[in-house]
């Protein structure tokens, strides 16, 4: 993994910082694990914008990643590491002993030729997936399930990890990267190690067009709009004249928006603000 600062041959290249990984496969992805990916432009089925700042971007194929890791007792070998345009982490193509191939998230330290396994009796080794009741307290894990069998939902981005703090009865206590401490059923699965490509945070796109390639449109401040477009718009000078709100009038600072009271009992400590 190398961090490359581009030479200022043009204004758009002057501030570009790239992450170069020589271990990534340079060929085409495995065709059987690709799916089509249509762009919505942030619109719903009525054609109305439901998510702002989305539109355009390069055409992409979706890589079908195995988040369940449910092939228990069947050893697998890592064939190669690949780039995935749909996520910040890299992915690994693994070949199971029964001949099936699957994509998984590539943990830090995993390389081509390594052996991995899944199941309750799997070894405590980077890349192996097993129920958290079988993982020692204090271990670092990623790709953590929130419900048994549902598939990984927590700690899937580049460089993220979760630490197992305690095990009490049917639950384990986890500390997330956000600082939140929460309980999850001990039967939920997790993968040993942290997600790879942790240098992703050091990259610099260098120009607005690089964001457009990724399907991200500009974000305009409400104060720069007209009153018809945003509550902060209009007025003389640079004064919003009110408490900061969203384009639809909801308070933007200090207003609690969490609605799922049913799962509050599993949160031991809220995330760091």
Curated annotation (Swiss-Prot):
Composition bias type Basic residues, residue spans: 253-273
* InterPro entries hit by this protein: NA-bd_OB-fold, Rib_uL2_dom2, Ribosomal_uL2, Ribosomal_uL2_bac/org-type, Ribosomal_uL2_C, Ribosomal_uL2_dom3, Ribosomal_uL2_RNA-bd_dom, Translation_prot_SH3-like_sf
Alphabetical keyword list = Ribonucleoprotein, Ribosomal protein, RNA-binding, rRNA-binding
One of its Pfam families is Ribosomal_L2
| Signal peptide stretch | none
GO BP field: cytoplasmic translation
Annotated region (Disordered) at: 35-54, 222-273
The biased composition feature labelled Polar residues covers: 39-49
State if Cell division is listed as a keyword.
no
Which stretches are tagged as biased composition: Basic and acidic residues?
Answer: 229-239
Q: Which GO molecular function annotation, any one, does this entry have?
A: structural constituent of ribosome
Gene Ontology, cellular component aspect: large ribosomal subunit
Q: Which NCBIfam families match?
A: rplB_bact (TIGR01171)
Return the similarity comment.
Belongs to the universal ribosomal protein uL2 family.
Assembly, in brief, is: Part of the 50S ribosomal subunit. Forms a bridge to the 30S subunit in the 70S ribosome.
Q: What this chain does, per the record?
A: One of the primary rRNA binding proteins. Required for association of the 30S and 50S subunits to form the 70S ribosome, for tRNA binding and peptide bond formation. It has been suggested to have peptidyltransferase activity; this is somewhat controversial. Makes several contacts with the 16S rRNA in the 70S ribosome.
Record protein name field: Large ribosomal subunit protein uL2
Species name: Aeromonas salmonicida (strain A449)
Name of the coding gene? rplB
